[in-house]
């Protein structure tokens, strides 16, 4: 019965075919349907009586004979295709000749059951069907004796095609039947092999198997029955059409034989697909009736078949429910595409308008103006009430253009679910309250950036918005305690809350929040100084689903909070983010408790927690791959060791910020190379970062890096070349902060940076240097042209310095590099004082002038370490004794004293000496490696410097002087230890010190050579730049002086001779002079008056002189690529700039 019902339902869902006479019904015969035989026969008889035309009356006998023949024909046709004789009982599987019932026998007879399924002979069915078709067609030929022979051949062809199609249907049924039989047979064999006839499980399986067989037979029976009905319908419709055709022929009308159309219809049937039956049969009957009616009503001799109209197709989408249609239209990517469909129908218009106004797309002022033009109208003036369709409003991108007036137009949006007013600084609380009034479906409100937030917003939410789930209101200073309490009490569904900078937020409200809002997953109550550990303990205990927790700049928070929490709850599995920035009283104990409670923590913000040490980083390393963001700005006690442990364990970190962590060195940059998913680096004011560390990090991370934002402001030791390599390795880089990095404060580079925020002071504007967006791409392109080509940051530093010397043609033919260096050094030593003085280094603010360059004796740099010139006379050691003492030396410490060792522990570096002397030598080893690192950094910086001309060298000169003084101090300490050992007269002490000298003499000599070569290149670079800068200074003076002289000469000529008419406008003269100078620089020197002007002194302002000397930009000369002055009053850019800098460094506002 289930199969019958399914077939019946399927037949009712069939689609109408195409009934054009020349095309035929498409796929109307290819589905299974269940029809009642009696109803079908009655319908056919009714159709025959009502639509069949009467034969023209010739004689009563002829009419009677034809009527009798028709009755005989109908009876014969019904008998031929009647399968009622095939009884259901004869088709069911039997057991010993008896039909099976629900009480199956325990005797298992699989073969007998399978044979019962083969009771239907498909060949017999095919023969019966074809016999019926043949008889029916033969009767047609007898009843229509006047048909020409050609048309009789068409009838015969139609019969053959019908028979072929019947055979195809039966083959499909037979294949399906055999497939089912084979599957059942396999199951029978499996059961037979098991031999568990008495098993209840086997009996249960047999019951299921028999039901499957019965279902298969029912399905097969229904398929054959449906096929009979389909063939019957074809024959009936063909008969009616052929009768009508014959009557038309008798009347003398020219009509088309319908046999061809029926042949096309039969050939178009696909027996392998399932299509509509019921509607297809109805369309076929409609065609027959229309054909006959046209024959009776149109006696003229025209082609009747051409007047049969095609049934207008039904648009499929119109049959879908409105909800489904809404989902389909909403899937279009571009919303403006669906605007074209507004005129399809009223239903479509309503759905499309709802989609368009559900979340209006407002990203720029033009879109806002267009949207407001509609919202200014009342609901009576518009076709639809658009306010009721709006559910989400976001004005974050047009915040500067939103005021109270514009927001008031949205009052009445009763179905509003989300309202976002981020950075809408001109809006007050009154229109916000008006918009929210009556919004009972409201879920989220974000008014970040609203300066004036009062009680009415909180009261409105408490009264009209019981479903609110998210409320973000930073800087809620003016909200009273009562309003806060009222809002919390009436917001039981609250999940996300952000109320900051409110002194009324105290322990009572926090506890109320824990009791009334148990669904909270995000809590942000930063800058709430009256909240203490006790209330937060209750809050964290109740909120088991908490994911994000922020409580910053609160000195009341101590280690007791999370230590007590560990005693109350076992864990906080949902916690993903914690922000305790500015909570200065927490220590490493808090971090340990947090890690134990929240093992899946992803984001940790501990900026300005000054008591945090490396121990916290060791604890955070337990989070492993879960950790993604770490912020340790102003955590001064963090060192490279803690960073190394953190990065080695947490390799999926994406964002790091160590701003103002002054103890971090280049080793931290090396460790950053182990983070393959790193996107953001914050190292603002990490003054120990140098070119060497940055180049190594870029080299280790490789090309196509994932970095997107890099903050290196106040890293004053960086030069242009490592930044160039960083840009070339990071194609995704969109933000680069280099504020107060002297090498980048030059007009040709700062022209690509963003304008400084409007609230910055003049000094802050001078050092501001931030590149973002297109500025980063322009900077990369400019540095490509500015920097000497290199094959990545792996180029040997010594090779770079040597090539620079060769590029200046300072090595003569046949002269070795050593000889050339000695000659160059001799020449430079004579000019060093003048070169260094010309840099104007003493004018640099903040530079320590105690390290005077006059103290550097460049002529005797090779003798800076005089300790190894001192010899120990009379001390002799055999090779066995030397090897024995060498075995006692801790060579690991000598090679790297800063590896994972205790700095306070002393290792053997001078075997045989006492503990005090060995401790002194350990200290000297550490100092030597610090010196070596400084010289390596200095060497890399100089190598980077020579790649780009006119870089700021003041800090390199300072580094050079400082390194020289370190060398002097280290030499003094070594000489003092040697003197003490020699005066002691202890042979063992002297032998131990000789072993140390044996290990380190070559290292010290190598250090001196690196320093010497770097100082030579640096001085050559300064000399070359000073020469060019002097030339530029002369050209500037000449240009200004020439313009002044030209104006005087022009005035004199006009007054005296009035011969030449020269433009008197000063700006025009300047432009003319500029164009002339740009066209040919030599024209200026060819002017007789050019050299005369150098005889006069011309005043240059200090700013101009500083620009010429140091490459600093002039604030009045900042230009963009199109030589247009940058507008520094752009509010969006200024706000964005200030936000980026502030987000990168908590104290960036103290520029």
From Swiss-Prot:
One of its GO terms (biological process) is positive regulation of D-glucose transmembrane transport. It is found in: Membrane. Pathway: Protein modification; protein ubiquitination. Gene3D superfamilies: Ribonuclease Inhibitor. The keyword Repeat applies. Pfam families: F-box-like. LRR repeats lie at residues 399-423, 424-449, 450-475, 476-501, 502-527, 528-553, 554-582, 583-608, 609-634, 635-660, 661-685, 686-714, 715-740. Residues 1-18, 58-72 have a biased composition (Basic and acidic residues). Induction: Expressed constitutively at low levels. The modification Phosphoserine is found at residues 199, 300. Residues 314-361 form the F-box domain. Residues 38-49, 1066-1080 have a biased composition (Low complexity). Its main location: membrane. One of its GO terms (cellular component) is cytoplasm. Keywords: Carbohydrate metabolism, Glucose metabolism, Leucine-rich repeat, Membrane, Phosphoprotein, Repeat, Ubl conjugation pathway. PANTHER family: PARTNER OF PAIRED, ISOFORM B-RELATED (PTHR13318). This is SCF E3 ubiquitin ligase complex F-box protein GRR1. The gene is GRR1.
């Amino acid at each position: 019965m289930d199969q019958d019902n399914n077939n019946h339902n399927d037949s009712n869902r069939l689609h109408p075919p195409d009934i054009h006479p020349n095309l035929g019904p498409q796929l109307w015969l290819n589905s299974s349907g269940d029809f009642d035989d009696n109803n079908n026969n009655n319908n056919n008889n009714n159709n025959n009586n009502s639509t069949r035309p009467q034969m023209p009356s010739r004689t009563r006998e002829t009419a009677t004979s034809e009527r009798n023949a028709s009755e005989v024909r109908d009876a014969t046709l019904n008998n031929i295709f009647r399968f009622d004789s095939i009884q259901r009982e004869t088709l069911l599987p039997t057991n010993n000749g008896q039909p099976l019932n629900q009480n199956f026998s325990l005797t298992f007879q699989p073969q007998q059951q399978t044979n019962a399924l083969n009771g239907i002979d498909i060949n017999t069915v095919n023969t019966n069907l074809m016999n019926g078709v043949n008889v029916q067609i033969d009767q047609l030929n007898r009843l229509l004796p006047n048909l020409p022979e050609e048309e009789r051949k068409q009838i015969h062809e139609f019969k053959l095609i019908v028979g072929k199609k019947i055979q195809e249907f039966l083959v499909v049924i037979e294949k399906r039947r055999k497939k089912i039989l084979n599957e059942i047979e396999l199951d029978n064999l499996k059961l037979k092999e098991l031999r568990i006839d008495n098993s209840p499980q086997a009996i249960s399986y047999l019951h299921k198997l028999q039901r499957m067989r019965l279902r298969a037979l029912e399905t097969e029976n229904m398929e054959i029955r449906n096929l009979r009905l389909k063939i019957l319908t074809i024959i009936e419709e063909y008969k009616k059409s052929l009768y009508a055709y014959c009557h038309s022929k008798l009347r003398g009308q020219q009509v088309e034989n319908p046999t061809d159309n029926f042949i096309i219809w039969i050939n178009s049937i696909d027996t392998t697909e399932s299509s509509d039956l019921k509607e297809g049969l109805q369309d076929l009957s409609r065609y027959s009736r229309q054909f006959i009616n046209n024959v009776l009503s149109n006696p003229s001799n025209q082609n009747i078949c051409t007047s049969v109209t095609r049934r207008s197709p039904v648009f499929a989408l119109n049959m879908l429910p409105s909800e489904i249609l809404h989902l389909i239209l909403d899937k279009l990517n571009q919303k403006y595409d669906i605007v074209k469909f507004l005129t399809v129908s009223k239903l479509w218009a309503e759905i499309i308008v709802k989609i368009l106004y559900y979340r209006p797309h407002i990203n720029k002022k033009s879109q806002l103006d267009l949207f407001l033009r509609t919202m200014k109208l009342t609901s009576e003036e518009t076709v639809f009430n658009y306010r009721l369709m709006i559910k989400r409003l976001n004005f974050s991108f047009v915040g500067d253009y939103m005021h109270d007036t514009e927001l008031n137009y949205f009052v009445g949006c009763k179905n509003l679910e989300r309202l976002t007013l981020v950075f809408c600084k001109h809006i007050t609380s009154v229109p916000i309250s008006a918009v929210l009034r009556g919004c009972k479906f409201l879920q989220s409100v974000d008014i970040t950036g609203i300066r004036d937030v009062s009680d009415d917003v909180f009261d409105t939410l408490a009264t009209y918005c019981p479903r609110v789930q998210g409320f973000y209101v930073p800087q809620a200073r003016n909200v009273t305690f009562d309003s806060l309490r009222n809002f919390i009490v009436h917001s039981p569904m609250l999940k996300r809350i952000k109320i900051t900078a409110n002194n009324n937020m105290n322990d009572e409200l926090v506890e109320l929040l824990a009791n009334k809002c148990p669904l909270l997953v995000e809590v942000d109550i930063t800058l709430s100084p009256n909240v203490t550990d006790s209330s937060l303990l209750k809050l964290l205990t109740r909120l088991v689903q908490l994911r994000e927790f922020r409580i910053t700049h609160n000195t009341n928070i101590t280690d007791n909070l999370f230590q007590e929490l560990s005693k109350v709850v076992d864990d906080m599995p949902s916690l993903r983010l914690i922000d305790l920035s500015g909570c200065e009283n927490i220590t490493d104990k808090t971090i340990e408790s947090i890690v134990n409670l929240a093992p899946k923590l992803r984001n940790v913000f501990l900026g300005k927690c000054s008591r945090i040490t490396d121990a916290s980083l060791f604890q955070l390393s337990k989070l492993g791959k879960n950790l993604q963001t770490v912020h340790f700005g102003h955590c001064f006690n963090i060192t490279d060791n803690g960073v190394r442990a953190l990065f080695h364990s947490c390799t999926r970190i994406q964002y790091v910020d160590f701003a103002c962590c002054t103890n971090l060195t280049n080793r931290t940059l090396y460790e950053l190379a182990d983070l393959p998913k790193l996107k953001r680096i914050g190292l603002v004011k990490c003054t120990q970062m140098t070119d060497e560390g940055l180049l190594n990090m870029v080299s280790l991370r490789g090309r196509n890096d994932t970095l997107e934002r890099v903050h290196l402001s106040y890293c004053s030791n960086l030069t242009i070349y490592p930044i160039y390599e960083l840009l070339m390795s990071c194609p995704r880089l969109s933000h680069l902060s280099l504020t107060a990095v002297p090498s980048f404060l030059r007009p040709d580079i700062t022209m690509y940076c963003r304008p400084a925020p409007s609230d910055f002071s003049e000094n802050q504007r001078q050092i501001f240097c931030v590149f973002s967006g297109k500025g980063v791409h322009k900077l990369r392109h400019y540095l490509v042209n500015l920097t000497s080509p290199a094959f990545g940051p792996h180029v040997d530093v010594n090779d770079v310095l040597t090539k620079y010397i060769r590029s200046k043609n300072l090595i003569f033919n046949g002269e070795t590099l050593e000889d050339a260096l000695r000659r160059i050094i001799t020449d430079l030593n004579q000019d060093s004082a003048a070169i260094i003085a010309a840099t104007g280094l003493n004018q640099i603010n903040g530079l320590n002038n105690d390290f005077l360059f006059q103290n550097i004796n460049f002529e005797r740099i090779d003798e800076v370490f005089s300790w190894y010139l001192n010899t120990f006379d009379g001390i002799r050691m055999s090779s066995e004794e030397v090897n024995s003492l060498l075995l006692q030396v801790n060579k690991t410490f000598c090679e790297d004293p800063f590896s994972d060792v205790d700095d306070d522990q002393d290792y053997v570096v001078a075997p045989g000496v006492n503990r005090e002397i060995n401790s002194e030598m350990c200290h000297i080893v550490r100092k030597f490696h610090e010196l070596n690192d400084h010289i390596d950094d200095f060497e890399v910086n100089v190598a980077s410097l020579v790649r780009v001309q006119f870089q700021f060298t003041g800090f390199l000169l300072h580094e050079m002087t400082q390194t020289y003084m370190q060398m002097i101090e280290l030499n003094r300490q070594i000489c003092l230890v040697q003197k003490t050992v020699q005066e002691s007269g202890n042979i063992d002490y002297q032998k131990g010190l000789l072993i140390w000298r044996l290990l380190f003499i070559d290292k010290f000599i190598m250090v001196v050579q690196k320093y010497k070569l770097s100082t030579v290149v640096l001085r050559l670079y300064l000399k070359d730049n000073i020469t060019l800068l002097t030339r530029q200074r002369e050209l500037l003076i000449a240009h200004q002086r020439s313009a002044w002289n030209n104006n005087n000469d022009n005035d004199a000529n006009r007054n005296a001779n009035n011969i030449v008419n020269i433009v008197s406008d000063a700006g025009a003269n300047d432009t003319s002079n500029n164009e002339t100078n740009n066209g040919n620089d030599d024209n200026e020197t060819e002017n007789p008056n050019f050299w005369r002007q150098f005889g006069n002194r011309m005043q240059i302002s200090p700013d101009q002189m500083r620009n010429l000397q140091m490459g600093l930009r002039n604030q009045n000369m900042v230009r963009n690529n199109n030589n247009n002055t940058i507008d520094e009053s752009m509010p969006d850019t200024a706000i964005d700039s200030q936000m980026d800098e502030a987000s990168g460094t908590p104290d960036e506002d103290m520029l």
